[in-house]
Amino acid sequence: MKTYKNLIYKNITLEKCKEIILKASKHKKKKKSVQKILSNIDYYSKELYTMVQNDKYAFKEVHHFEIIEYGKVRLIESSPFYPNQCLDYLFLECGLKNIILNKINYESFGNCPNKGIHKGMKHIHKELLDSKW
């Protein structure tokens, strides 16, 4: 079996960390925690880079809360923007994306382009039309 042990660390640079923070903050720029990171992006991108290079990264605790939507109680898990979401984006972009995207189902992962519910629906519809029964 092929191993991908050091694939992530070869692709990480300071510019890539800065780009990842900006990409992860898309559609979240009104949150105070995101504004704090973006106001001092050079410091946080350097900190993210050193965290990954020294293998000293630790994910923070996920916040759990409940909302009531249409009479149904839903349990929501919210991970902190820094470092959790930034590290997720970083690991996905710097090596795992090429490995994972080819192996996941269309409908199971909506975070990446050309994946998610709509692409899955088109795929299933095409499979049903092409089937012989």
Language model feature labels by segment:
Residues 2-7, 92-133:
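Active-site-proximal segment of RNA-dependent polymerases
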